[in-house]
Amino acid sequence: MDPFAGTGQSKSYRTFGNVFQRLSMSGNPKPLAKKPLLLPEASKAIEFWNYRDVIGGEEAEQERNERASRIAISRIASSRSSIPEYRQAIMQHLTKHVQQLDQLAEW
């Protein structure tokens, strides 16, 4: 028997729609869905995932910056006429790493 046929006992989506329509028209101003219950463990898990996303975002941004500087150095190195620019880019790159090492040493 076809459940979507128009004759007989129909278990189509229309009957569910009628149920939802009756519930929505019942005059009850409160929504049927309740707020989810958050346990302390759940809030700790949420804080952990937010922390992980922040740390992961900073690490990804740092990797993108390092990759961009490596690409810039390789492009400058590929053109022979720009030796001073190449040296300057290398010095900037090394300066960044030295600054990072200084920050880690202070930590």
From Swiss-Prot:
GO biological process, one term: mitotic sister chromatid separation
Effect of disrupting the coding gene: Abnormal spore wall formation. Abnormal spore wall polysaccharide composition during sporulation. Irregular spore wall thickness.
Main location: other
A cellular-component GO term for this protein: anaphase-promoting complex
Compartment(s): Ascus epiplasm
Alphabetical keyword list: Cell cycle, Cell division, Mitosis, Ubl conjugation pathway
Self-association state and partner proteins as the record states: The APC/C is composed of at least 13 subunits: apc1, apc2, nuc2, apc4, apc5, cut9, apc8, apc10, apc11, hcn1, apc13, apc14 and apc15.
Job description of the protein: Component of the anaphase promoting complex/cyclosome (APC/C), a cell cycle-regulated E3 ubiquitin-protein ligase complex that controls progression through mitosis and the G1 phase of the cell cycle. The APC/C is thought to confer substrate specificity and, in the presence of ubiquitin-conjugating E2 enzymes, it catalyzes the formation of protein-ubiquitin conjugates that are subsequently degraded by the 26S proteasome. Appears to play a role in spore wall formation.
Protein name: Anaphase-promoting complex subunit 14
The encoding gene: apc14
